[in-house]
Design a protein with these regions (language model features):
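Small/polar-rich, solvent-exposed N-terminal microdomains that initiate assembly or binding
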Residues: 1-63
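Compositionally biased, intrinsically disordered low-complexity segments enriched in polar/Pro/Gly
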Residues: 1-3, 44, 71, 133-139
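Oligomerization/assembly interface segments of phage tail-like spikes and tubes
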Residues: 71-84, 121-132
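Acidic-leaning, charged glycine-interspersed low-complexity segments
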Residues: 93-139
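Amphipathic alpha-helical segments
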Residues: 5-18, 91-105
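Short beta-strand/turn micro-motifs at beta-sheet edges
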Residues: 63-69
Length: 139
């Protein structure tokens, strides 16, 4: 079984700008990324740029049918980019959008482009959708 959210994650860390802005070396000397699923862990250093991948409409759904069988799967993701620098947030968001386009996701209306005074962070949240190729339903 394939995992689309992990595929998105792996493609994001393949992007040089995203890798540069979100990577860090953990206590064990291993490279990690400030790219998280669903929510931000309390232990994450939020003074540095980070990304959250969320499925804003719930789990994937069947997109096309034939003979009562799903032929394609639809994925909806919201990708939040947050940092304390507005231009860094914009640079990462642009890199995310380019990466999502490369893997077949289209951008949807909605999202967020705002500064939150409580957290002192700029947030750019964009929504994306993709239908898998016909017969690619092993998710």
């Amino acid at each position: 079984m394939k995992d689309m959210m992990m595929e998105v994650y792996n493609r994001l860390i393949d992007n040089p700008l995203i890798r540069e802005k979100t990577s860090f070396i953990n206590d064990n000397g291993k490279t990690e990324y400030r790219i998280k699923f669903y929510e931000v862990p309390e232990t994450l250093n939020t003074t540095k740029p980070f990304i959250v991948i969320d499925n804003f409409l719930g789990p994937q759904t069947n997109a096309y049918f034939a003979n009562n069988k799903a032929l394609s799967i639809r994925f909806n993701y919201q990708i939040n980019v947050e940092s304390m620098d507005r231009m860094v947030t914009k640079q990462i968001s642009k890199a995310v959008e380019e990466t999502m386009k490369q893997i077949g996701f289209g951008r949807l209306d909605g999202g967020l482009d705002q500064y939150f005074n409580e957290t002192k962070r700029f947030v750019d949240a964009r929504r994306y959708r993709k239908n898998t190729q016909i017969h690619d339903t092993d998710y």
